[in-house]
């Protein structure tokens, strides 16, 4: 490991490139916000866990539902989004020898819009005027300024997305007939999904604003919920697609191997983009007013995403085995010993991949009509969400940070920070596994989600939840230790680590891999296919919600 960390930069000069300084400042700004958000959101998560276990009574001026709303908003809309944009803008800078000046400017505009929007949403939460949780659909109503803040966040996403589109389109004009570099290809897929999935939630927010101001008396709840989940469902898979970019492209390079198949990688990206938005109704299986036929169609569309996930599992473990055997691995399973377990850049994403096995299985459970009836409004769902986001996605982001932060900062990963990263990885793994297990188990026993601690009049069933909730609090406490270690490592790598050139690791394709067909570059076709599937999934039910609208709801404030 020390040899890897102390490799002679001069001997690798042809493979290592310093990042454009102006692009580096932009990327560091995004990463700084991302990990500051992790610290704040993590502290709020600890308060939730301790309160939910009955250990901590929160004051009336900062209650559980304020904390829950802020925790979700900060980690879901801020931490992940800033990381994703900073990550892919760094990748495009690396792929294309620097960002175009206008694209860099658009990156800064997006940054400013998102920061402004974030501040506008947080202030009403702190004033206890927006405790509507991350799932901010009606009938609960926040301050209208909360929703106006969301508009700025969405517009910021659009600006960042179009910046990426301009960068890729310009390169393609100058390099006709060539394939877009694989990391930028992943980025294109992610930004396509971000743009199109945010359109429904933008429509929802513009429905809510006049209702929240009191200009109209009621709102169509079913329509608003459906528009939200067209976005919310896709957002989870945007994180997943971002994580898989590191799995496919970076991890093989860190192992000293190569990508198994460029064609398969691009087909997986296309599949995830085309099939993603259409599964929103599987979050609404228990909702009235939606026909069983529509629900089953969306369940099928949700389960279809499992196909590219299985392709990913096959490709990655084929890469692992092939590389490990090249490095001297022997036997049926003995080759695992040749994998770089002491390199945090590999270990954290690998554990994240393994965590996706139970996380994905839980998603299948929640897409199944009968099983969903049992777990839908229980802590099981929170456990599933923390496995998918907290383990699969965030741990991949952590692993990425140990080479990305040095790359954009012009510094080196030291053996000391690598060791801290290994400790952080295991602390986080144990903490999140403990908490997620407790959430799943107590959910099966009937403990509801989205509620503060209560014994429900010392009811025997509720008292039976306490051991699991205590386990939840223990897991949450370990997680905040992991957060502090991670933020410390990021600050060190960004400002205090020794100066040096760190490579943006991009694995080459195997020499004997088949040539990638150019139809994978026909993004116009894939976007049309995506829109056709979206139309199949949503036109009929949304028309039904509008033409045969249920009674509208006035705004409710339940806190």
Regions found by a protein language model. Give the residues of each.
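Non-transmembrane, amphipathic alpha-helical segments
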Residues: 18-21, 25-28
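Acidic/aromatic-lined carbohydrate-recognition and catalytic surfaces
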Residues: 139-140, 145
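Membrane-interface helix termini and inter-helical loops of multi-pass transporters
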Residues: 57-58, 133-136, 287-291, 373-376
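Membrane-interfacial, low-structure loops and terminal tails that flank and connect transmembrane helices
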Residues: 4-20, 173-177, 323-342, 413-415, ...
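Short, membrane-interfacial amphipathic segments enriched in basic
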Residues: 216-217
